[in-house]
């Protein structure tokens, strides 16, 4: 029977015990009326405000670390009505590092009652989550002026754990004002000085500073430091305007009104313009003193000196300028060449000298602008020379030239006719026609060729002994010297030596009457066929 009664009472006892333990634990861990702060070094300051009036004579706070073998106790003293405070000194020195960021403290409030000591409250305290540093101290004025002042301070008992997270606030007030009207300055970095500006000269001020560590869950500002009083210097008697912006404003307004006054004077005074012009003109140098020839030539007109010597229409061509005639290049063995030679032989008269004639044209710039591979050459004379099929009689013992044999080489010109330009040496010299044609606009503007009188060649052309050598001779050969000039004959009229003839030996030849060349017309194949219908091709 006793066993049955115990079996149903045991669960009831356990339930009541659990409820009592939960109630006691809630009462112990309730720290809303106990506020403690750690100064990051060796001090924990606590403030206890009991929830109900207690009939006690004294109370203490006991601190125990979960990682260290010491217990610390401080006595609570009343600071105001229903408030008790004390400071737990954890280390032997105020600057000793007694706790770390992983330490936990168990704080208990114990009070003495009539029957003995009773534990009133117990809570767990995280030191680095509840930081409140000591107020800054040692405020001093570093530099002071009439409107500016530099003040510094110091902080102490700050752990190296929180030193990089410090921020400051400073407030300034006039000596006869309250702190509620003070100006607050925030310093978001670890700066232990402040530079005050826009102060009033010869005025007294007070300054206070506080610090906070931006670390942990609960961040609390330190108490304000002791106020430091200072006085600015009196103003200099020369300073008439106390505000800098007012001085700048007056300067700008003065310049503006001065400019308007000058404009009005220049507009209203008519005689001032010529006088000012005369005054400024005296400092301008007269160019006629340095350019006397131009001054006398243009009558002292400077604009005429600088203007163009020709009108603007001079640079715009109004009509098409005459051009040089196109050149006809004929093959010596072609049918057209044979027809031309036959027609010339039929209509020409013998030349007094017995040699062919050549027409010379002065071409200035044609080859420079129209030849793709032309070098930079000066203006020169271009000779257009041909020989209308001269036949020479040779001695009985000598060989006779065939009818289709090439023309003998030309002799160099004499006198002043040899001052033509030397072109780059080439193996393919062209036959140039001296005929003049109508200007062709496809070539662009060019200089009109200047026709010169026909040149007379000396008599006595040596004949070539071998037809093979004649086959190698070009129909038109222009012999040039080493210096680029043509070789000239002697003035006595002697026979000029030809290199080809010197190789074969000189023989006496008789020159047939040479056709008189018409240098003003060069008949084309169509014109020849129109004149002589018996030689149509």
From Swiss-Prot:
Span list, region Disordered: 442-466, 479-498
Membrane topology: Single-pass type I membrane protein
Gene3D superfamilies, sorted: Immunoglobulins
Disulfide bridge map: 36-46, 74-86
Domain annotation Fibronectin type-III: ranges: 135-235
Subcellular location: Cell membrane; Cell surface
SUPFAM superfamilies: Fibronectin type III (SSF49265)
GO BP field: cytokine-mediated signaling pathway; immunoglobulin mediated immune response; interleukin-15-mediated signaling pathway; interleukin-2-mediated signaling pathway; negative regulation of apoptotic process; positive regulation of phagocytosis
Cytoplasmic compartment residues: 268-537
Main subcellular location of this protein, as a coarse class: membrane
Compositionally skewed regions (Polar residues) per UniProt: 487-497
PROSITE patterns the record matches: FN3, HEMATOPO_REC_S_F1
Extracellular membrane side: 27-239
Keywords, ordered alphabetically: Cell membrane, Disulfide bond, Glycoprotein, Membrane, Receptor, Signal, Transmembrane, Transmembrane helix
Domain remark text: The WSXWS motif appears to be necessary for proper protein folding and thereby efficient intracellular transport and cell-surface receptor binding. The box 1 motif is required for JAK interaction and/or activation.
Function: Receptor for interleukin-2. This beta subunit is involved in receptor mediated endocytosis and transduces the mitogenic signals of IL2. Probably in association with IL15RA, involved in the stimulation of neutrophil phagocytosis by IL15.
Subunit structure: Non-covalent dimer of an alpha and a beta subunit. IL2R exists in 3 different forms: a high affinity dimer, an intermediate affinity monomer (beta subunit), and a low affinity monomer (alpha subunit). The high and intermediate affinity forms also associate with a gamma subunit. Interacts with SHB upon interleukin stimulation.
Entry protein name: Interleukin-2 receptor subunit beta
Taxonomic placement: Eukaryota, Metazoa, Chordata, Craniata, Vertebrata
